[in-house]
Amino acid sequence: MKIATLAVVSAFAATAIAGPIRPDGVGNDKFLIELGPGETQWVTKQQKHEMRAYINSIYKAGQGFVDITDEFGTDFTTAEVVPANYPKSALHAAVVNPMIAGLSKENLMRDLNTLVKFNNRYYESPTGVESATWVFNEVQKIIQASGVKGAKVEKFTNKFKQFNVIATIPGASKNTVIVGAHQDSINQKDPMKGRAPGADDNGSGTVVVLEAFRNVLKSKAIQAANATNTLEFHWYAGEEGGLLGSNNIFKKYKADGRKVKAMLNQDLTGFTKKGNPEQFGLITDNTNAELNEFCKTIVAKYAALKIVEAKCGYACSDHASAHRNGFPSSFIAETNFRNTNPYLHTADDVIANLDFNHMLEHAKVVVGFMGELAMTPNL
């Protein structure tokens, strides 16, 4: 995707300022974005939105950038990948199958109907904060109802208004397994005030992770504190602004020396194009090859759909934040990016376009991923 990122840079070269050197007069109105390893530009907020729109017009979905403004002047280097040992087969069906049995399409519908009622979930809008608050409160209710000892939820704040939500289920070890989804949405023409229901992008991933969390907490093994590894469920802020929330989290985890052994991203889980085979898209660029193989094992064991490998370009979603900070990550999307939802980032990204049966298959994969790795020793 090197050529693609260079094409984007060229398209904006007349107005954007080459990085990484801070140009004279640059203040809070300029942002440093990374379009690929070593490819940076200073842009205004308007240019950042225009660049995202330009990228979308060419690639439809995928190919993005990371806003690395806060890294300017630091010695950021891509960390060495945290080593992990993934099972070659699914070994904990007795734990996972009850989780799958509890998954509810009705819960997915109910939760998504709530999310799309916010005018938008843009990371700097009032309703973007309100939607994050709704997710936080919902997670809190789920934890309280479960009675699982040590389970907790916290707000991970950012310099912008919207916060990340992190739920933790402690295990016997500090080795951590994460599933995440961004909950913000954007109307590309009017980010702050425009209608952006974001049903697919990424209300669908948000509620899939929420429903998975609900059923992992119902597991007898989890309730008995038998998990070997710590589990985290993330709902990210500001993905549409350049992976802002997730990059903040994984930068801190890297600085803190956290042992994140696996991260699974759920972004776009509900759209299937008519006339095309229903399938998962397993993203192979900017992800971990060994973890991807484990994901194939999970899909084969617990889901009814098959996988097709695909690429989505640099920084296309939040798994890239984990990847650039040295943590193994995978991304399973609703399909390959050639057949993705044509309504993304518009007022027409609505529930009527989605398939809740497809979303349920994603939820099966998530609980399979989390359940299996929760119980894996020596990860």
UniProtKB/Swiss-Prot annotation:
Q: Which keywords has UniProt assigned to this entry?
A: Aminopeptidase, Disulfide bond, Glycoprotein, Hydrolase, Metal-binding, Protease, Secreted, Signal, Virulence, Zinc
What's one Pfam family the UniProt record gives for this protein? Peptidase_M28
Which cofactors are reported in the record for this sequence? Answer: Zn(2+)
Kindly state what the record says about how the cofactor is bound: Binds 2 Zn(2+) ions per subunit.
**Residues involved in Zn(2+) 1 binding:** H182, D201, D267
Instruction: Give the residues the record marks as binding Zn(2+) 2.
Output: D201, E240, H345
Q: List the disulfide bonds.
A: C312-C316
The GO biological-process annotations, alphabetized, read as: proteolysis
EC number(s) on file: 3.4.11.-
Q: Is Transport set as a keyword in this record?
A: no
Glycosylation: which residues?
N202, N226
Signal peptide start-end: 1-18
Cellular localization per UniProt: Secreted
Q: Name one GO molecular function term.
A: metalloexopeptidase activity
**Major localization listed first in the record, in broad terms:** secreted
User: Per the record, GO CC terms?
Assistant: extracellular region
Summarize subunit and interaction data from the UniProt record for this chain. Answer: Monomer.
Q: What does this protein do?
A: Probable extracellular aminopeptidase which contributes to pathogenicity.
So what family is this one in?
A: Belongs to the peptidase M28 family. M28E subfamily.
Q: What is this protein called?
A: Probable leucine aminopeptidase TRV_05286
Native organism is: Trichophyton verrucosum (strain HKI 0517)
